């Protein structure tokens, strides 16, 4: 007693608050000093003391104890300011939606995390005995995240799917939530309840499927006799395995081979491993250890004790009769059921990670090697440099040189030689991938905010990603523009009298889009009432047609109306790239005479925009007489055939898939040499030899038979095999035969063909072809020829009514015959389609009016006229002049020479040259029609009115760039016409007039590197210009004859600085068609521009059409075509970016399900099915078909098994759940144990496409001494459950009727080896006592057919021996060098 009192006197009394870490240290010291038993007694006393003090203190939580952090106000205000700046940058087009989303998340996440970190220091300083602080800080009740929501801010919330809601909740629960914040909070607040209900059912269903697939796996034998093994090594070069994982992998396993340290054997084969033996392996660093796993067991429907290993319950080898399959299924499924509750009651608050910043320690200049970095764009849209290796950055100040090493894949946010201040961020280091175990590729769709036409720069790839789609890929960062305009959503407007560039009152077509019927190109009937208007105050006129089939023409419109379509004929339109294809459906009965060609074969081809070019095809007819069903070669009788594309006065024909050259017929006959052609894949098994002779209906491949007999020619090309069959006679000529020396020649009838034995008079045309199998051996093949005679020119009346060819406005329609294939070109038919050799085309042409410099174009429109109850369809064709003066003439011809009578023609302004003032600025009730196509490729009108444009100016101190003034007087009597040309074209100056001219001193460099030498050319000072979507630039002063200087009208703005007495010249240049982003100042003391395109440039002001920019980065997909009309809400761009998944099991559990069902998890992770196909293909190509299939399937299955095990382990390990590998291996073994019988190689046992077990296929092949070709497949747990040996088990799982019906038809036998089928039928179940009876029914112990010293299938490093009847073929595979063969 005295000794204890003396020891107590020497003890030091500590009176301070301790935390959890200090308590752990105290307990550790107590155990070392007093032992385990006495320490537990001391801790019981501490626990009792704690409860007593807590009861006496009665700590409770009141609302007054929730104290808001004082720094929250300015932190939230700073975050709001950053978000506002970010929103402006997004509106200006500097960052796109994904970059804005990322930066917004990190701004608010950083703010929330800073508030959480300030929480405890604030309580410690202001109120250390606050109940909230004591509870959360000690961990007795609640945690930091929950208290943070009470006194800090709730922050960003997650929805039930784990996606982040980008609107943060700035309030905390103490302050109260607004209505909007409460609604957003409800998404996350119920997250735990939703997970408990919904995910619980998902986890339960997963457990049921897992048990279903392995319910028949029972331990039935002690040793299966296998010598296969999986190599496990902690010192793998590709990936170092941690010691903890290495121990967990080995404990409880059984060795597949002896283990040596030097020459001493330390462990024997079939010895189970304990912790002591594993520690010796780690200490001595032995070679890689080969262990037995469920993967290596040779059984098909059971497992042996040694391959399973120790039982986790008692630590010894598993007992016979134990249902290890059901245990494995529950071991994997049950943790998922429990882990749905692991939400920690945080209310769905989003948790993520931010980047680590490197800051400058003091002021100085940055120095680094520019060769080691390259410019890039950060994930927030900021310019930066990316380094791939360690980069040394030096900061030089006046007296200190500091060096900072930037790790690889980091962003450098400063430039070389840049001066930085102290604490300035100079680099951004992204956190490693270990922070977020799961990443997914997410698609974010950007929708149009306004209505208008889509324009893009040349950076957008105009070629669609897929054929006939409207998706375009973006190769680099650029802007997409939506030019504003109010659309009149009717596809029928194209067929009315309104033309492009017409001036009109806006209320005239201000019709709701839904109330106007639309034209569908998918075989819908076209219906439209034809009307006209003169754009004046007159009423709308409806013409009255007296003759149904006559030509209707007026002096006002100058159009041809031809009754091409007959009574009750339906107009069916078919999309064909950028044109309509309209086949004729019916004709009048009285016209169906013999000499008439059926109209069903005639197709009218009209561009979607309705505009024809000169010498373009209007219609075509395919004569069935020139149609073949077989492939062959075309030969001309003469060589007088011209390529149409090469001749200027001929036709350029645009085909469906590609440009196809046509050849004008100048011969009276041509020849067709038939041949049978088969295009086969590279891996096809051909059953005939090259240069062999076969008969009709001979098997060429497994599924293809020949249609004709003849000579076989096999040509192996890139990734395909071309097999040809030449029919005809074979001759062996003498050396004196001159004809046989030619490689291919046509011989007319009547000419003798002589060989060494006989002579023969040829009655028909033949084709002689020299065949040379070898250098010294040749023969001649005489092939039959089909001769086609060209008949007389087809009568036009047999194709179209005579009224169509009445010429008006110089429009001419002519018929031409064209051969679709060149001389000697092969013709190939696809599937059962026929091949058209000759096409009859109707060509549209007209004479260009040289007196008028305006462009003329032919437009075609569809109209439907209802006269006396009869509905007639018409095609209207006519010449149209496409400039403004023509429109004014068409509107009111009598007011052509009156001044001021047409001021309302321009929607933007009207200028009087005499007064020189702006009469009318941006009229609200007028608009200009633009013709476009909407998303459905239907024609539509876009009305550009003053509400879509804004005017800036007038500008002061404007001077022209590189010009001097000079006055020239010259009379003219003609109006200067408007010109149309692509961007960058130098326009020829036609007329000079009396005006103030400017002489250009230097040459102007036009776009596309075209230079215009203008040293002696005079241009006027233009008042204004207008550019439209078609690239035409107009001078909008209708009463002045001004020569326009297109495509390079630039302005420089000079501003006087009165303080310094000098002129400062800015570098801003304004050009027609130029795009401006918002908030770009073109000149000092001038208003900031809104985003848009320069539409009109005046002397002292510009008119800009409003436009919204959308920034897009490489890899984005643009939906829609150039100049396509988009409505508000239409999909514009799709961004694809990587996103970190939430770390809870609610996202991990579906991932486990996706892995077990063998579905593609995401586009970032490797797709196992693609890897399997790649392995099968590579191994087969290297080793040949028989051995390639066997070895390829075996190695592919091993690879996929270990990859699946690692993926499932990774999901559960991230949640802190440890599942032994053997449970996962039993499940994976079942979904990877099937192979698919392939078609290559004949088999008398299994059918092609049949699913069989891998071991069964190997044993059957050895028993029959016949190679069975198969390839590995991955089955999900659902498919594996429906492909078992028991149809009773399958029927009790899913699709009961289908399974039982198929089993009855096939006569399947169920041997009742599994647990489930015996439960269903009330028999003795296999596990436990029933295992002995089931084992007796099975075959006796399998005796291997080879000796133990020779029968190694896989030994040590997975070495595989294959034994053939003819001999032994040894193929060694050193699997330990492959990084994927590794168990974690």
UniProtKB/Swiss-Prot annotation:
One of its GO terms (molecular function) is zinc ion binding. Its cofactor is Zn(2+). Disulfide bonds: none annotated. Its EC number is 2.7.7.6. Zn(2+) binds at residues 224, 297, 304, 307. Signal peptide: none annotated. It is found in: Plastid, Chloroplast. GO terms for biological process: DNA-templated transcription. SUPFAM superfamilies: beta and beta-prime subunits of DNA dependent RNA-polymerase. It holds the Pfam family RNA_pol_Rpb1_4. It catalyses: RNA(n) + a ribonucleoside 5'-triphosphate = RNA(n+1) + diphosphate. InterPro entries: DNA-dir_RpoC2_beta_pp, RNA_pol_beta''_euk, RNA_pol_Rpb1_3_sf, RNA_pol_Rpb1_4, RNA_pol_Rpb1_5, Rpb1_funnel_sf. In plastids the minimal PEP RNA polymerase catalytic core is composed of four subunits: alpha, beta, beta', and beta''. When a (nuclear-encoded) sigma factor is associated with the core the holoenzyme is formed, which can initiate transcription. This is DNA-directed RNA polymerase subunit beta''. The lineage of its organism: Eukaryota, Viridiplantae, Streptophyta, Embryophyta, Tracheophyta.
């Amino acid at each position: 007693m005295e000794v204890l009192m003396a020891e107590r006197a020497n003890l030091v009394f500590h009176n301070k608050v301790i935390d959890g870490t200090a308590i752990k240290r105290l307990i550790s010291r107590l155990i070392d000093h007093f032992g385990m038993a006495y320490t537990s007694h001391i801790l019981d006393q501490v626990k009792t003391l704690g409860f007593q003090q807590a009861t006496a203190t009665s700590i409770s939580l009141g609302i007054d104890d929730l104290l808001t952090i004082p720094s929250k106000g300015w932190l939230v205000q700073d975050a709001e300011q950053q978000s506002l700046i970010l929103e402006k940058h997004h509106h200006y087009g500097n960052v796109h939606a994904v970059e804005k989303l990322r930066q917004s998340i990190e701004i608010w996440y950083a703010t929330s995390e800073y508030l959480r970190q300030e929480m405890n220091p604030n309580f410690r300083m202001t109120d250390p005995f606050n109940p909230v602080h004591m509870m959360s800080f000690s961990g007795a009740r609640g945690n930091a995240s929950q208290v943070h929501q009470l006194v800090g801010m709730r922050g960003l919330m997650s929805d039930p799917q784990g996606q982040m809601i980008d609107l943060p909740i700035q309030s905390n629960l103490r302050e109260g939530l607004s209505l909007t914040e409460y609604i957003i909070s409800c998404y996350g607040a119920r997250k735990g309840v939703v997970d408990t209900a919904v995910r619980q059912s998902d986890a339960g269903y997963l457990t049921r499927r897992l048990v279903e697939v392995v319910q028949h796996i029972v331990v039935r034998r002690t040793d299966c006799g296998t010598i296969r093994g999986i190599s496990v090594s902690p010192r793998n070069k590709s990936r170092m395995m941690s010691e903890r994982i290495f121990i967990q992998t080995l404990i409880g396993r059984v060795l597949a081979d002896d283990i040596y340290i030097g020459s001493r054997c330390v462990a024997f084969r079939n010895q189970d491993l304990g912790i002591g033996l594993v520690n010796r392996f780690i200490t001595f660093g032995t070679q890689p250890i080969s262990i037995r796993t469920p993967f290596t067991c040779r059984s098909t429907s059971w497992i042996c004790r040694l391959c399973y290993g120790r039982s986790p319950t008692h630590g010894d080898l598993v007992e016979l009769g134990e249902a290890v399959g059901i245990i494995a299924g529950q071991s994997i499924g049950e943790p998922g059921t429990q882990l749905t509750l692991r939400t920690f009651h945080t209310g769905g608050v989003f948790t993520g990670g931010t980047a680590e910043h490197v800051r400058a320690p003091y002021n100085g200049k940055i120095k680094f090697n520019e060769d080691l970095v390259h410019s890039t764009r950060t994930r927030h849209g900021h310019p930066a440099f990316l380094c791939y290796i360690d980069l040394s950055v030096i900061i030089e100040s006046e007296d200190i040189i500091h060096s900072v090493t930037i790790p690889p894949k980091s962003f450098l946010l400063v430039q070389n030689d840049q001066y930085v201040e102290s604490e300035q961020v100079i680099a951004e280091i992204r956190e490693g991938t270990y922070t977020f175990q799961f990443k997914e590729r997410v698609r974010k769709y950007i929708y149009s905010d306004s209505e208008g036409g889509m324009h893009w720069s040349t950076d957008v790839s105009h070629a669609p990603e897929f054929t006939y789609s409207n998706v375009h890929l973006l190769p680099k960062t650029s802007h997409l523009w939506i030019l504003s305009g109010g659309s009149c959503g009717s596809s029928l407007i194209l067929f009315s009298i309104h033309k492009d560039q017409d001036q009109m009152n806006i209320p005239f077509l201000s019709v709701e889009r839904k109330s106007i019927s639309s034209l569908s190109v998918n075989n819908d009937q076209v219906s439209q009432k034809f009307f006209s208007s003169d754009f004046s105050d007159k009423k709308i006129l409806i013409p009255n047609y007296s003759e149904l089939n006559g030509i209707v023409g007026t002096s006002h419109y100058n159009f041809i109306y031809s009754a091409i379509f007959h009574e009750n004929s339906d107009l069916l339109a078919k999309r064909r790239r950028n044109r309509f294809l309209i086949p004729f459906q019916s004709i009048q009965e009285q016209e169906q005479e013999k000499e008439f060609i059926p109209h069903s074969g005639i197709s009218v081809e009209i561009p979607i925009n309705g505009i024809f070019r000169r010498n373009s095809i209007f219609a075509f007819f395919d004569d069935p007489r020139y149609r073949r069903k077989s492939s062959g070669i075309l030969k001309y009788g003469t060589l007088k055939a011209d390529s149409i594309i090469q001749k200027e006065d001929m036709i350029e024909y645009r085909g469906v898939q590609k440009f196809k050259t046509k050849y004008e017929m100048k011969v009276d006959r041509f020849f067709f040499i038939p041949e049978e052609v088969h295009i086969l894949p590279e891996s096809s098994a051909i059953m005939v030899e090259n240069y062999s002779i076969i008969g009709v209906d001979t098997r060429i491949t497994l599924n293809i038979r020949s249609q004709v007999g003849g000579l076989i020619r096999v040509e192996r090309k890139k990734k395909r095999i071309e097999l040809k069959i030449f029919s005809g006679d074979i001759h062996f000529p003498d050396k004196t035969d001159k004809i046989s020396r030619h490689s291919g020649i046509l011989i007319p009838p009547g000419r003798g063909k002589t060989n060494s034995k006989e002579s023969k008079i040829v009655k028909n045309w033949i084709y002689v072809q020299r065949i040379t199998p070898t250098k010294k051996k040749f023969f001649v093949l005489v092939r039959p020829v089909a001769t086609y005679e060209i008949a007389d020119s087809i009568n036009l009346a047999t194709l179209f009514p005579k009224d169509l060819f009445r010429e008006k406005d110089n429009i001419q329609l002519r018929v031409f015959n064209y051969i679709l294939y060149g001389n000697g070109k092969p013709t190939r038919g696809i599937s059962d389609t026929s091949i058209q050799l000759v096409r009859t085309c109707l060509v549209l042409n007209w004479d260009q009016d040289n007196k008028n410099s305006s462009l003329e174009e032919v437009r075609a429109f569809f109209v439907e006229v209802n006269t006396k109850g009869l509905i007639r369809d018409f095609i209207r064709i006519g010449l149209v002049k496409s400039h403004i003066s023509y429109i004014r003439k068409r509107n009111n011809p009598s007011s052509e020479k009156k001044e001021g009578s047409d001021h309302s023609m321009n929607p933007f302004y009207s200028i009087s040259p005499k007064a020189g003032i702006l009469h009318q600025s941006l009229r609200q009730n007028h608009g200009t029609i633009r013709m476009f196509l909407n998303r459905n490729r239907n024609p539509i009108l876009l009305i550009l009115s003053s509400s879509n444009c804004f005017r800036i100016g007038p500008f002061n101190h404007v001077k022209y760039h590189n010009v001097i003034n000079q006055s020239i007087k010259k009379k003219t009597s003609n109006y200067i016409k408007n010109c149309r040309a692509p961007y960058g074209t130098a326009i020829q100056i036609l007329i000079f007039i009396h005006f103030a001219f400017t002489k250009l001193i230097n040459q102007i460099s036009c776009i596309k590197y075209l230079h215009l030498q203008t040293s002696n050319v005079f241009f006027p000072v233009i008042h204004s210009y207008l550019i439209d979507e078609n690239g035409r630039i107009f001078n909008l002063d209708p009463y002045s004859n001004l020569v326009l200087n297109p495509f390079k009208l630039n302005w420089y703005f000079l501003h006087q600085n009165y303080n310094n007495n000098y002129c400062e010249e800015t570098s801003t240049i304004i050009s027609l068609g130029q795009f401006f982003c918002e908030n770009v100042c073109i000149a000092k003391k001038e208003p900031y521009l809104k985003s848009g395109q320069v539409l009109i440039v005046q002397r002292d002001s510009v008119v800009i059409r409003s436009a919204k920019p959308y920034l897009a980065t490489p890899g984005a997909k643009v939906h829609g075509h150039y100049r396509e009309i988009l409505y508000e809400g239409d999909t514009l761009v799709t961004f694809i970016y990587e996103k970190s998944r939430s770390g809870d099991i609610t996202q991990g559990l579906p991932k486990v399900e996706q892995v077990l069902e063998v579905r593609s998890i995401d586009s970032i992770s490797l797709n196992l099915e693609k890897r399997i196909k790649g392995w099968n293909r590579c191994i087969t190509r290297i080793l040949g078909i028989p051995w390639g299939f066997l070895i390829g399937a075996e190695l592919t299955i091993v690879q996929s098994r270990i990859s699946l095990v690692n993926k499932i382990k990774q999901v559960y390990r991230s949640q802190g759940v440890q599942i032994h590998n053997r449970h996962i291996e039993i499940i994976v073994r079942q979904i990877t144990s099937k192979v698919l019988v392939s078609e290559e190689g004949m088999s008398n046992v299994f059918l092609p496409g049949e699913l069989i077990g891998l071991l069964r296929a190997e044993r059957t092949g050895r028993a029959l001494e016949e190679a069975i070709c198969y390839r590995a497949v991955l089955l999900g747990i659902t498919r594996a459950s429906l492909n078992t040996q028991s149809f009773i088990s399958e029927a009790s799982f899913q699709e009961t009727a289908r399974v039982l019906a198929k089993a009855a038809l096939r006569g399947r036998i169920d041997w009742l080896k599994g647990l489930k089928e015996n439960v269903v039928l009330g028999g003795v179940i296999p596990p436990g006592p029933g295992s002995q009876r089931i084992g007796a029914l099975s075959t006796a112990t399998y005796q291997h057919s080879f000796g133990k010293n020779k029968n190694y299938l896989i030994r040590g490093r997975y070495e595989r021996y294959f034994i053939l009847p003819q001999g032994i073929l040894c193929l060694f595979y050193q699997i330990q060098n492959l990084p994927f063969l590794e168990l974690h």
